[in-house]
């Protein structure tokens, strides 16, 4: 029984790893994460700062949110995004460090 529950745990964990990896597999999403590492921003601000259309930025943000990397909150007509956890900043920083060294 313990082996079965351990297998379920590992399957869920590696499934989440894969979802995160897929979400990070796009350069625009990585840039959006870097912008959000500097603080909460609206979709409009993120689109402007990243050079994306509003629709394209929204699609990328949705993928990051579905992977659990960012969270959103609504403020009237505006949606603001932020990193879901400080560990997301560490992940982003680690990826940047590895990329700069390679």
What are these regions (language model features)?
Residues 1-16, 34, 86-102:
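Amphipathic alpha-helical dimerization/coiled-coil segments
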Residues 48, 59, 65-66:
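Alpha-helical residues within the helix-turn-helix
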Residues 15-55, 74-87:
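N-terminal helix-turn-helix DNA-binding core of bacterial DNA-binding proteins
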């Amino acid at each position: 029984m313990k082996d079965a529950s351990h297998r379920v745990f590992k399957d869920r964990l590696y499934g989440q790893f894969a979802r995160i990896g897929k979400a990070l597999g796009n350069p625009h999403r990585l840039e959006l994460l870097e912008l959000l590492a500097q603080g909460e921003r609206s979709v409009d601000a993120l689109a402007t700062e990243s050079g994306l259309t509003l629709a394209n930025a929204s699609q990328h943000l949705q993928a990051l949110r579905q992977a659990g990397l960012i969270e959103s909150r609504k403020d009237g007509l505006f949606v603001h995004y932020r990193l879901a956890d400080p560990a997301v900043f560490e992940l982003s920083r680690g990826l940047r460090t590895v990329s700069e060294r390679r």
